[in-house]
Amino acid sequence: MHRLTLPAPAKLNLWLHIIGRRPDGYHELETVFQFLDHGDELTFALREDGAIRLHTEIEAVPHDSNLIVRAARRLQEQSGTGLGADIWLTKVLPMGGGIGGGSSDAATTLLALAHLWQLDWDEDRLAALGLTLGADVPVFVRGHAAFAQGVGEQLTPVDPAEPWYVVLVPQVSVSTVEIFSHPQLTRDSLPLKMRPVPEGNSRNDCQPVVEQSYPEVRNALNSLGKFTEARLTGTGSCVFGAFPSKAEADKVLALLSATQTGFVAKGSNVSMLHRKLQSLVKKSSA
């Protein structure tokens, strides 16, 4: 195989509690990640000369510091391969939205190139490499909804309900550094002691600070909150609400379309990236 096209799915933080701050400045978190059947798309083509070339219309991030390029080069260095790749990115997910666009792109890159370069790397090794690129990368490498602890890298698989979601995308990029350094951020939520993880009595501890700093996000939460419980995902700008059917979610998004931008997507406990990879493995072994 010399060419491969794979999705890079979005994720939601169904809730996010900050339970402390470490001596190195990073925050201790508890959160639940769930995937959406919606995301970017990447195409990879094998190069024999070892070069990594990213082709995209997005110019906000310099080529060499783009997380896709960094992931490819890190895997190249660690594996010792002499192969390279051309990578085409079709960008759908917003930057700074809190739905994992950059981390998901990096994870798809690691999994795709491990397949394309025929590396004998298992998921554990790829997830460990992913962690060096960002705390959210391992959950995309693993591909299963998870209860996350630590800085988000300690993952326990979970299977929450898989509703349809309306996700609103305010036209603003939220700075994670700004939010986590905000003096009014809650940093002392009590760690959960119940298993399985309770869905009730949860929240996003970053939401009050983001609402205060970004009126566009506050307006989106208020708009969606007229129809269902609306919540911020991660430390980004996107807000979401759950609905029992696609028809109901589509109706709500249509009602909000005059003032809000967004999309409807199905929640999924197994990412569409992993479903696609599993189908490729089945085809190759058939």
Swiss-Prot record:
GO terms for biological process: isopentenyl diphosphate biosynthetic process, methylerythritol 4-phosphate pathway; terpenoid biosynthetic process. Pfam families: GHMP_kinases_C, GHMP_kinases_N. It comes from the Bacteria. The keyword Transferase applies. ATP binds at P94, M95, G96, G97, G98, I99, G100, G101, G102, S103, S104. Its EC number is 2.7.1.148. It is an enzyme of class 2 (transferase). GO terms for molecular function: 4-(cytidine 5'-diphospho)-2-C-methyl-D-erythritol kinase activity; ATP binding. It catalyses: 4-CDP-2-C-methyl-D-erythritol + ATP = 4-CDP-2-C-methyl-D-erythritol 2-phosphate + ADP + H(+). The active site is at K11, D136. Belongs to the GHMP kinase family. IspE subfamily. Catalyzes the phosphorylation of the position 2 hydroxy group of 4-diphosphocytidyl-2C-methyl-D-erythritol. This is 4-diphosphocytidyl-2-C-methyl-D-erythritol kinase. It comes from Pseudomonas putida (strain W619). The lineage of its organism: Bacteria, Pseudomonadati, Pseudomonadota, Gammaproteobacteria, Pseudomonadales.
